[in-house]
């Protein structure tokens, strides 16, 4: 059944209702901020956003006596959207609460489009994106490549992580080895672990120590189990694979930041089945495929689409085996998913 198209008046009414709801929520929050600021607030200091709950955030103090303590803070109305990993300036209250007064500059941000296609940051100040996949649900190179393009576009180092290595068997071993070989040949760091059995977890901890990392990957690949294995006692809820679809159920609803003993931090974000790249251009996608770098600009035609054009450097590299067919298929699939204006 085709999706019903809304007319202009219906769209206007929906936006009006949503705007009124947002205004009421902002007004309530503004009154709470005014009440706090009218009381006995402490001096301004820096803090770290460790979780976001709509109009409020949890922050961890970074200075003085409050360092390491967690506070639920209100947001001033003029602040930009905050995400887990943001560093902020805040003032503490006397009831375990406080007020965020400013956002500090970000060194990086990981973004993706929301349902309306508008760019939305999901984590800040990340310097390592851990792309998690597993034998089950079946890994798809296209989804892995989407994450790699996103990491390259954001300037964040990627780490490929095959979890549930204990589920490798005769039925999936050949396909998995072929998949991993492609990324190893490209020079991407890759680890194989089993959160369930503990295999490879010490090596993973060493990779995470000293970095601000975020785990990404489709539901069911074991991100929550990895957190439980890395940080005993956190008890992130684990969901089983659906017997009907073979896909995972979402178990983490709010992005949270955790600390590792070695000084590194982990942002555990909600699992997603499809990672959109609507905010990137064709040039961004091409730049996200690292094996293309030395070939771009060498085609016969300046506006080459790398499809069927004669003298295409990428097609010649594909024929010569310097570009894997799997990666070229992913590249074309990602381009086809972009808005027409960017294609």
Curated annotation (Swiss-Prot):
Note accompanying the cofactor annotation: Binds 1 zinc ion per subunit.
EC number(s) stated in the UniProt entry for this protein: 3.6.1.-
Compartments it resides in: Cytoplasm
One protein family per Pfam: RsgA_GTPase
Keywords attached to this entry: Cytoplasm, GTP-binding, Hydrolase, Metal-binding, Nucleotide-binding, Ribosome biogenesis, RNA-binding, rRNA-binding, Zinc
Annotated residues for binding of Zn(2+): 299, 304, 306, 312
Cofactor (UniProt): Zn(2+)
Ligand binding (GTP): 163-166, 217-225
Cellular compartments per GO CC: cytoplasm
One of the protein's GO biological processes: ribosomal small subunit biogenesis
Molecular-function GO terms, alphabetical: GTP binding; GTPase activity; metal ion binding; rRNA binding
Domain spans labelled CP-type G: 116-275
InterPro entries according to UniProt: G_CP_dom, NA-bd_OB-fold, P-loop_NTPase, Ribosome_biogen_GTPase_RsgA, RsgA_GTPase_dom
CDD domains: YjeQ_EngC
Entry similarity comment: Belongs to the TRAFAC class YlqF/YawG GTPase family. RsgA subfamily.
Function comment: One of several proteins that assist in the late maturation steps of the functional core of the 30S ribosomal subunit. Helps release RbfA from mature subunits. May play a role in the assembly of ribosomal proteins into the subunit. Circularly permuted GTPase that catalyzes slow GTP hydrolysis, GTPase activity is stimulated by the 30S ribosomal subunit.
Record-linked PANTHER family: SMALL RIBOSOMAL SUBUNIT BIOGENESIS GTPASE RSGA (PTHR32120), SMALL RIBOSOMAL SUBUNIT BIOGENESIS GTPASE RSGA 1, MITOCHONDRIAL-RELATED (PTHR32120:SF11)
Subunit-structure text: Monomer. Associates with 30S ribosomal subunit, binds 16S rRNA.
Name of the molecule in the record: Small ribosomal subunit biogenesis GTPase RsgA
Organism: Ectopseudomonas mendocina (strain ymp)
Name of the encoding gene: rsgA
